[in-house]
Amino acid sequence: MKGCLATMDKELWIKRANDSLVKHFYEQQSDIEQREGFESKLTFGTAGIRGKFGLGEGRLNKFTIEKLALGLARYLNAQTNNPTIVIHYDIRHLSTEFAQIIANVLANHQIIVYLPDTYKTTPELSFAVRNLNTTAGIMITASHNPKDYNGIKVYSSDGAQLSTDASELVSRYIEEVGDPLQIDIPISKQNTSYIKPFPKSVTDDYMKHIQNMIGYIPKSDLQVVFTSLHGTSVPIVPELLKSLNFNQFNLVEAQCKPDPNFSSVQSANPEDHRAFDQAVELANKSHADLLISTDPDADRLGIAERDAHGHITYFNGNQIGALLLNYRIQQTSQLRHRLMIQSIVSSELTKSLARYNNVEYKEVLTGFKFIAQEIRQLDDHQNMIFAFEESYGFLSEPFVRDKDAVQIVPLIIKYASELKLYGKTLKDELEQIYQTVGRHEDTLFSHTLEGLEGKKKIESIMTHFRSNPPQEIQGLKVKAIEDYLTSEVYQLDKDTTSQIDSPKSNVIRVLFDEGFIALRPSGTEPKIKLYVSLKCPDFDDVAQKINAMIFS
């Protein structure tokens, strides 16, 4: 009977294919991919919804977007009288169309919608929510995912992504909508009057906040190459740099044009060195010193440095975090009660640097919304000077409540330009940090374990660490094990257990005197990540052996 219903359901969807906006994507998919759309449902989680285009409730299409929008409209009207919202969207396939669909549904429920006429960055959306004082915000993006993906992120009134509790409530409202093929959205002039143009003044204010944060960029002969990886950071980043009287940059022209197919990049992810290939070519031709890339929605940023011999040094997210924290510590020496916030899987290096400079630090779960929650709870006397995640997400000043590559680009250029005046590089500065607080090193192993066997393997690894805590790993003596699923920390040397003040998450962190390792399964994919952050000789060898021991 279930198979018959699935077949009927598929037939109904195929009949509506011409109206779905995704017929072309569906027709390009394999039989398995097509079937997945009918055998699963998109779920609204803590990071919103992200998925492939296609037919069925397990894919993004006109009807599933209408269902999401209707659930969100009911949620907003239940939360407050006369709700308002601002929508931004990136350069991906159907981002513009999805934005208009959502705006129409919300307007149909008497919700005022601010909708721009062009693509915008994610940090601009976070700022706009705060600047316009709206009830919520929506960002339509799938960050650096492949071209056949898109997604919807929802923001609360403080410009941060929805809390876990709010996300669960929105999810329930969406589910209560029922069959997306049965939704009827009447559109009238009276309703569309609720859709307002996005004020240019908001973008101007955002630029002013960054200009005030940077002040000026000192004159040096620093040369920069920049790529937006076909995303949203052009034109805003070049305009911002020019407004700060910095013109010594070249754009990777082929990659600085919006392109939903990401035609000129193997990967639109700044974590991936391949994303820099064309930037390296241009840097060699122009003898540039600094290479910067942003991901398609401009919330994350990667950097590399070219020396006089043409050698390229790529910095990982933790190293960029350490450099930026070091610079912010220098910039804010006059402030008291300084605070740095980072995720629990980010480096020991930045914590050591904070301690050395008498800067308080806090650790939060992975996900920038948890950093935003800490910012929201700051006392009046606390000064947040920097926040970051090892996955290349950084925030210098909290007028934005999400990762913000746009404000970081001129900050890193200013830092590099100052160093250039003294004949130094970012690589030199990182080496100085190591000499000051020790050579803490970091690496990440990501394992994809498909199918039922893979799921069992992931569960087995996590269960083993919970039920049989190791005394030592590769000669490193275990001090404590933090289990964020039970919110408990077990101190091995004292044989005591205490509570962790944190929301629950399926993460285990094993602490040593030398640093930590952390295990974190994905909530949506058949993946598990191992983070290694240690100060020890032969780091690479030790990290590889730890990985082999756990996943053999």
Swiss-Prot record:
InterPro entries attached to this UniProt entry: A-D-PHexomutase_a/b/a-I, A-D-PHexomutase_a/b/a-I/II/III, A-D-PHexomutase_a/b/a-II, A-D-PHexomutase_a/b/a-III, A-D-PHexomutase_C, A-D-PHexomutase_C_sf, A-D-PHexomutase_CS, Alpha-D-phosphohexomutase_SF
Protein name: Phosphoglucomutase
Cofactor(s) the protein needs: Mg(2+)
Keyword terms: Carbohydrate metabolism, Glucose metabolism, Isomerase, Magnesium, Metal-binding, Phosphoprotein
Gene3D superfamilies in alphabetical order: Alpha-D-Glucose-1,6-Bisphosphate, subunit A, domain 3 (3.40.120.10), Alpha-D-phosphohexomutase, C-terminal domain (3.30.310.50)
Family the UniProt entry places it in: Belongs to the phosphohexose mutase family.
SUPFAM superfamilies from the UniProt entry: Phosphoglucomutase, C-terminal domain, Phosphoglucomutase, first 3 domains
Keyword Phosphoprotein: yes
Gene behind the chain: pgcA
Alphabetized PANTHER family for the sequence: PHOSPHOGLUCOMUTASE 2B-RELATED, PHOSPHOMANNOMUTASE 45A
Keyword Metal-binding in annotation: yes
Binding residue positions for Mg(2+): 143, 295, 297, 299
EC annotation from Swiss-Prot or TrEMBL: 5.4.2.2
Lineage, top ranks: Bacteria, Bacillati, Bacillota, Bacilli, Bacillales
Species whose genome carries this gene: Staphylococcus aureus (strain MRSA252)
Pathway connected to this protein: Glycolipid metabolism; diglucosyl-diacylglycerol biosynthesis
Task performed by this protein: Catalyzes the interconversion between glucose-6-phosphate and alpha-glucose-1-phosphate. This is the first step in the biosynthesis of diglucosyl-diacylglycerol (Glc2-DAG), i.e. the predominant glycolipid found in the S.aureus membrane, which is also used as a membrane anchor for lipoteichoic acid (LTA).
GO process annotations (BP): enterobacterial common antigen biosynthetic process; glucose metabolic process; purine ribonucleoside salvage
Catalytic activity, reaction form: alpha-D-glucose 1-phosphate = alpha-D-glucose 6-phosphate
Organism superkingdom: Bacteria
Active site: 143
Cofactor note text: Binds 1 Mg(2+) ion per subunit.
GO molecular function: magnesium ion binding; phosphoglucomutase activity; phosphopentomutase activity
